[in-house]
């Protein structure tokens, strides 16, 4: 494993002005981690002085410039210290984790989900944590702008109504809880995972840590190669963000890769295995039905979901209904016992713009809405997965129908990609569609890397994919009226006009790349970030901001 990117924090990763800060809870003994960047100047925004900016931070302990971490030991089980006794869980006889912690499960007939407690009127430590985290220690600023800070009660209400989820398996004590819902900050997910053609456990753990450090709010382990269980264990024990999986992939490995030999029993045991390890949410393709297969098979690009194609093959081979649909209530009984959220997979998402918004896609969406209500009956947290390849002018309909058919459960989309001809640049393609759908109410964007449709991404691709989708999510937050997002842009604009390069680097979504590009270009002029009153795009004689300042000064 590369120690520079994982076990040993890079002291300059976020810049020398950056530090890790915590905000204490008032209901529970929690410490909410954030990033604080000190600014060289004091900037005035709406009459308020700012000499620093608190930022939402997904890097966890790995982002602490003073921390040392051994990925072979894992992170500290911080949630174990919060003192919340739900009275409904007990230890199992399951396999010990690499941290020597026995898995826990709900007592017979009980539920331990965030939705369960929310509906009972109970504010959990996780609810208080995400409320503090969403505000970024800027409650006074939010109120000054005419907004309302997020409160634990608001979080509880959103979770109780199913409009938001807090994916936090009781067996994943290492995570820093986060919330997914359209009334909160837009989140992004990064996919990692080995395949039969390459990648080791060390590489996947490194990519997971790398993704968190660059801004991934959740990580999905989509491993389909060897050592799936061990790879997932290492990732979970070192992840400060929720981890999702597609259990069907491991179930398929257990039957030698033959979809026809899958069974409910194999799948059920896989769910329990992964839930005991601490997986926070499962993508489950329960919405693809035998009756919808003819519509999907008539498409230009057929079924492009791996899980969807596996279950379609099983249905055809056995001439039976999808067992993930017929056993959905049984699945929910397992999920409620560990607080694993279900991400209802869009097995029939369009794989080309010619298939967008067709009968197969929207027929499945209605089924997902029906399954949402069944999951909620058991207090299981739900989010809905969405497309896919959709041209810009057809995106709005996706968001409107999702809200209508799926009862306002959070929407989680792969893009959408707005064209089919952007190979090599599909991360940008995805971010274009993602920005639009997130501004309309999508809660989380699944990142796409430059390798989409071409190959397995490496850690540089992960970084690129995360940052591009972080831009999309931030742009959507601005469009939705986020006062914390607006403040960051306001401070950046003021720093830019003042030629305070270090402040610009600190406020950028990618401080490292921003600093590197500027240093490489300004060196040829003999200036530095401390002295340059221009950039090499225009030079000292044609810098519009410099000229504007000179003109204003002469008036």
From Swiss-Prot:
Keyword Iron in record: yes
User: Which annotated residues bind substrate?
Assistant: 191, 220, 249, 285, 305-307, 346-349, 385, 412
Q: Where does [4Fe-4S] cluster bind?
A: 535, 538, 543
Q: Name one GO cellular component term.
A: cytosol
Pfam families hit by this protein = ThiC-associated, ThiC_Rad_SAM
Q: How is the cofactor bound?
A: Binds 1 [4Fe-4S] cluster per subunit. The cluster is coordinated with 3 cysteines and an exchangeable S-adenosyl-L-methionine.
E.C. no: 4.1.99.17
| Record bears the keyword Iron-sulfur | yes
Family per record: Belongs to the ThiC family.
Protein name, per record: Phosphomethylpyrimidine synthase
Please give the organism.
Chlorobaculum parvum (strain DSM 263 / NCIMB 8327) (Chlorobium vibrioforme subsp. thiosulfatophilum)
Taxonomy of the source species:
Bacteria, Pseudomonadati, Chlorobiota, Chlorobiia, Chlorobiales
């Amino acid at each position: 494993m590369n120690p520079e990117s994982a076990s040993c924090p890079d002291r300059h990763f976020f810049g020398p002005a950056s530090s890790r800060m915590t905000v204490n809870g008032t209901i529970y003994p929690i410490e909410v981690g954030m990033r604080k960047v000190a600014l060289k100047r004091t900037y005035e925004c709406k009459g308020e002085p700012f000499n620093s900016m608190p930022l939402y931070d997904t890097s966890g302990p790995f982002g602490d410039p003073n921390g040392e971490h051994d990925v072979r030991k894992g992170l500290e089980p911080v949630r174990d210290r919060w003192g919340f006794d739900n009275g409904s869980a007990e230890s199992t006889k399951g396999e010990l984790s690499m941290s020597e912690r026995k898995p826990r499960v709900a007592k017979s007939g009980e539920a331990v989900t965030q939705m369960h407690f929310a509906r009972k009127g109970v504010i959990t430590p996780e609810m208080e944590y995400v409320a503090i985290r969403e505000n970024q220690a800027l409650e006074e600023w939010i109120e000054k702008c005419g907004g309302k800070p997020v409160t634990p009660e608001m979080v509880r209400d959103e979770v109780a109504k199913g409009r938001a989820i807090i994916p936090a398996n009781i067996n994943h004590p290492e995570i820093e809880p986060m919330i997914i819902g359209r009334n909160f900050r837009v989140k992004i997910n990064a996919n990692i995972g080995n395949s039969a053609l390459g990648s080791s456990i060390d590489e996947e753990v490194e990519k997971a840590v790398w993704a968190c450090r660059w801004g991934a709010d959740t990580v999905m382990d989509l491993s389909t190669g060897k050592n799936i269980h061990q790879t997932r264990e290492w990732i979970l024990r070192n992840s400060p963000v929720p981890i999702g999986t597609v259990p069907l992939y491991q179930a398929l490995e257990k039957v030698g890769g033959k979809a026809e030999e899958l069974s409910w029993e194999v799948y059920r045991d896989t769910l329990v295995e992964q839930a005991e390890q601490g997986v926070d949410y499962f993508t489950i393709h329960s919405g693809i039905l035998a009756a919808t297969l003819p519509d999907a098979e008539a498409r230009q690009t057929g079924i492009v979901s791996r899980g969807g194609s596996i279950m379609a093959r099983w249905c055809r081979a056995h001439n039976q209904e999808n067992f993930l649909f017929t056993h959905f209530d049984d699945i929910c009984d397992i999920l409620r016992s560990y607080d694993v959220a279900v991400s209802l997979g869009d097995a029939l998402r369009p794989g080309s713009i010619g298939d967008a918004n067709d009968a197969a896609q929207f027929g499945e969406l209605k089924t997902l809405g029906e399954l949402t209500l069944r999951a909620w009956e058991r207090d299981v947290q739900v989010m809905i997965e969405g497309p896919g390849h959709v041209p810009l002018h057809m995106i709005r309909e996706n968001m409107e129908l999702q809200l209508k058919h799926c009862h306002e459960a959070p929407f989680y989309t792969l893009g959408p990609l707005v064209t089919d001809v952007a190979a090599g640049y599909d991360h940008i393609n995805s971010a274009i569609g993602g920005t639009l759908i997130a501004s309309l109410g999508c809660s989380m964007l699944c990142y796409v890397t430059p390798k989409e449709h071409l190959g397995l991404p490496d850690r540089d691709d992960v970084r690129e994919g995360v940052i591009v989708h972080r831009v999309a999510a931030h742009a959507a937050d601005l469009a939705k009226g986020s006062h914390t997002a607006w403040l960051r842009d306001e401070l950046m604009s003021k720093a830019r006009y003042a030629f305070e390069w270090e402040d610009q680097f600190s406020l950028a979504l990618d401080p490292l790349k921003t600093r590197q590009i500027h240093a490489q270009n300004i060196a040829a002029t003999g200036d530095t970030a401390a002295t340059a009153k221009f950039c090499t795009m225009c030079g000292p004689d044609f810098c519009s901001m410099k000229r504007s300042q000179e003109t204003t000064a002469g008036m």
